[in-house]
Amino acid sequence: MTVLIPALTMAALGLAFGVGLAYALKIFGIEVDPAVALILSKLPGANCGACGKAGCAGFAEALKSHEVMPAACAVCEDETRVAIAEILGIEHKTKVKFIATLLCNGGSRAVDKFAYKGIKTCKAATLQFGGQKACEFGCLGFGDCVMGCPFGAISMGEDLLPIVDPNKCTACGICVDVCPKALFSLLPPDKKYYVKCKSTDIGAIVTKVCRPGCIACRKCEKACPTGAIKVENNLAWIYCAKCENMGKCLEVCPTKVIVRR
């Protein structure tokens, strides 16, 4: 009898709590829109936040209310975007693919101005006089981009520069946001040539702090037959809309800061 009473008491409490929870769910529960649930089932579930929403659930709700378009998800395959567009009853436009591209050619070849002993992150290093590199624009090499990429698309090379795997990169733009030096840019992969530098220092300074940097010699600008390259503010820029991948710029570049993808 002494065992039966506690057992019955616990059973009664369990029943009471169960009924209470069921009632609370009925009164306070939030019904999920079937369309949102269907859209969510199509999304990859990466919850990377690159779309600007609070994970895939937030993105699904934004899609249903037509705040965003399916193309805003960088992780989705094109067929997934088509399926979501059909659910929403809208026309889908194929998204042009981009790849995160590092615009720094320094790394281990760039001169250090002091021995950094602090926390091994680029963000922390930047707080100390802009980082240990003599080039104020250069990559610090601690891999904030590597840690920030949710798809494992970035690794550190032996030259202390990040390497982007084009097969894994979704162009989500997280590396663009986490790099304190703003050294990543999303570029179209069909444009094979780009200037791997962001320094706007004059050539004499660049030569002292980072020999493989852009010295604004204008040889590329003069050699380009389509006028796709302009040197502005001591830095060469390739305008993708005009570039026809001829490679003349790479041939004449004395520091080899223009590279082929």
Where are these regions (language model features)?
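Ferredoxin-type iron-sulfur electron-transfer modules and their immediate structural context
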Residues: 1-223, 227-230, 250-252, 256-260
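Glycan-recognition and catalytic cores of secretory/periplasmic carbohydrate-active enzymes
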Residues: 236
